[in-house]
């Protein structure tokens, strides 16, 4: 119903409610993330469970505008959790036709570059030069993350129809 509320340009209870709430025209939604950080604060799920939940809930992200496809984005791994990528891709590509490419258009990758730990990340604007160098060093790690997660994705999607969303 949420996708209908946002994107349907017609008469329906959800489109009517959107108009009543002050937004007559539908929004254009290019990307729709199904879950966020589901390995942590977004549900504390294991990857197999999330992959199956993704398969279920992506069904409800319908294209109400036949001219505009909503790209469905699955929740990807936290940093170097390659098992998450492996198991989500496995669950999403299990027993479907190749044209469905895992019922997703993208898989996100979460990586936060902070000089220390998440709990001691420091200020975004006031930091020592050594913290700047630490942050830049961690930023360079992104190339390895992209390369290794992409290799896993390619096992299931050799035609590269599923993009990595960083």
Spans of features found by a protein language model:
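Hard-cation-handling environments
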Residues: 166
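Long hydrophobic segments that form regular secondary structure
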Residues: 131-162
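N-terminal catalytic cores of secreted or lumenal carbohydrate-active enzymes
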Residues: 1-130, 143, 147
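The start of beta-strands in P-loop NTPase/AAA+ ATPase cores
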Residues: 105, 162-163
């Amino acid at each position: 119903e949420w996708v209908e509320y946002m994107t349907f340009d017609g008469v329906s209870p959800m489109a009517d409610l959107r108009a009543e709430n002050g937004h007559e025209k539908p929004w254009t939604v290019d990307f729709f993330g199904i879950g966020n950080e589901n390995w942590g604060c977004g549900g504390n799920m294991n990857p197999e469970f999330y992959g199956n939940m993704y398969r279920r809930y992506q069904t409800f992200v319908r294209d109400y505008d036949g001219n505009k496809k909503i790209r469905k984005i699955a929740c990807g791994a936290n940093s170097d959790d390659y098992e998450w990528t492996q198991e989500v891709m496995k669950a999403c590509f299990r027993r479907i036709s190749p044209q469905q490419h895992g019922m997703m258009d993208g898989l996100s990758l979460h990586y936060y570059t902070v000089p220390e730990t998440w709990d001691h990340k420091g200020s975004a604007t006031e930091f020592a030069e050594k913290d700047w160098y630490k942050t830049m060093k961690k930023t360079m790690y992104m190339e390895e993350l992209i390369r290794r997660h992409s290799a896993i994705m390619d096992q299931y999607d050799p035609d590269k129809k599923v993009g990595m969303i960083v």
